[in-house]
Structures are given as C-alpha cells and as structure tokens.
Design a protein with these regions (language model features):
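Small-residue-biased structural context
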Residues: 1-156
C-alpha cells in the first residue's frame, strides 16, 4: 500500500475494525471472556489511533476548505462521541449487563460513523482533492498512525 490514497487506507482500517467486532461476537458466543477482553482492548487502541491519525491528515485538510468543513466537523464530533463511549465502558464492569448494553450502543454508533464516512464523506472529499493530495494524505496517515498506536497503547 505504498502509494495508497487516504481513502484506501481509512477503508482498510474500517474493515479491520469490522473484523474485530466479528471476532468479539465469536468470543462472546463461545463465552470466552478473556479473548473478548483482549479483542476489546485491541479495538480501543486501534480505533483511538485511527481517529487521531485521520483527524491529523484528512480532517485537518477538510477543515481548511470551506466546502468540506461542515462534514469534517460532524465527523470529529462523532469521534468524540465514540471516545466518550469508550470512557464510559472503562468505568463499567467488563462484560456485565450494563457494559454489554453500552458496548452495543457504541458499536451501532461506530458502524454508522464509518458507513457514513465511506458512503458520503469520502466521495464528497474525493471530488475536492486531487489524486496527488489523496496520496500525500495517505502517506501522512501512514506516518502518523504508528505514533498514535504507541500513544494509545501507553494510555491504555
């Protein structure tokens, strides 16, 4: 993915997050709480790093363009909402009834967010960005994400 566009990189991450949700569902069905907790911790770190790198690359560019600003602001607010859910989940007994209910809400909101990005925001932004800009933003995202993963793991 050396020359992948920002949208390719973000979609790849979204697909990995969907796979983590599927693995968590499998672990829950198997009543494997230890595996579920590991997968959830992995999801938290991944999603936190993804959001930060996305905001530093694509969203920063979109916020600087009047015709894209509103969509970027909306997505930033959704990132904050997911972050708030993750904080609330940290305060609940892992895999308890309240935790499972809050997790289901967070999952629904997150899946809505990435679907909205892929189906609405990315196509709109792609019309405004050149192929060179998309590639440059993809490289910036790829550069920022490892640092953000490290930071997210340290916070966890």
């Amino acid at each position: 993915m050396a020359n992948a566009s920002i949208f390719d990189r973000l979609k790849q991450d979204h697909d990995a997050h969907r796979q983590l949700f599927a693995k968590m569902a499998d672990a829950e069905r198997e009543k494997n709480e230890e595996r579920l907790e590991k997968l959830f911790e992995q999801f938290k770190v991944e999603v936190t790093a993804h959001a930060a790198a996305e905001e530093e690359s694509l969203y920063a560019t979109m916020l600087s363009r009047p015709d894209l600003r509103e969509e970027a602001q909306h997505s930033v607010s959704e990132h904050k909402e997911i972050d708030d859910y993750l904080e609330e989940l940290a305060d609940l007994k892992f895999n308890g009834e309240a935790w499972r209910k809050k997790f289901a809400e967070m999952k629904k909101r997150y899946l809505h967010h990435i679907e909205e990005e892929e189906e609405e925001m990315f196509p709109t932004a792609a019309k405004d960005l050149t192929a060179e800009e998309e590639e440059k933003l993809g490289k910036l995202f790829a550069k920022r994400k490892p640092a953000e993963l490290e930071r997210a793991q340290a916070e966890d």
